[in-house]
Swiss-Prot record:
It comes from Lacticaseibacillus paracasei (strain ATCC 334 / BCRC 17002 / CCUG 31169 / CIP 107868 / KCTC 3260 / NRRL B-441). Substrate binds at S11, K43, T76, R90. HAMAP family: PPAT_bact. Belongs to the bacterial CoaD family. This is Phosphopantetheine adenylyltransferase.
């Protein structure tokens, strides 16, 4: 029987508890889950690819069938094909996410019909989380511990300044 390999692509800048929840759930569905740190050419990242990989690896250390990989600058579907993945995981927080992700899934299917996109609905507690909002909260000294895994929290404050400690 063929090993079921799924890719969970994203910029993960930073990796959030919502991302972690999606990875945990995907790890129960697939033999292997590759969390692919992608480059979003329309954004200036806070964390380097190496930092993202380290933070994702630390955050998913308890999940033996999960690994983090840096994806080269190319189409996600091409990356998935290159590692033998048959599935792409996408987390859906709301209707806006669904519309956007459905369009991308359609194009990806046109590019490679052998790779299926699987949507996982966000747990209600994570449906308002976004990396952009978390960076903003951290930059102004807000407490982000309930939004990100502990390694990410420490890295955020190290990057943005530890303003929340001075309150």
């Amino acid at each position: 029987m063929t090993k079921k390999i799924a890719v969970f692509p994203g910029s993960f800048d930073p990796f959030t508890n919502g991302h972690l929840d999606t990875v945990k759930r995907a790890s129960r569905l697939f033999d292997e889950v590759v969390v692919a740190a992608m480059t979003n050419t329309s954004k200036k990242p806070l964390f380097s690819s190496e930092e993202k990989l380290a933070l994702i690896s630390e955050s998913t250390a308890g999940l033996p069938n999960v690994k983090a990989m840096a994806a080269p600058k190319r189409l996600t579907v091409e990356f998935a094909r290159s590692i033998g993945a048959q599935f792409m995981i996408r987390g859906i927080r709301n209707v806006a996410d669904f519309g956007y992700e459905a369009d991308i899934a359609t194009v990806n299917h046109d590019l490679d019909p052998e790779i299926e996109t699987v949507f996982l609905l966000a747990d209600k507690q994570y449906d308002a989380l976004s990396s952009t909002i978390i960076k903003e909260v951290a930059a102004f000294g807000g407490d982000v511990h309930r939004f990100v895994p502990a390694p990410v929290e420490a890295a955020l404050y190290a990057k943005l300044g530890d303003a929340h400690q001075t309150k």
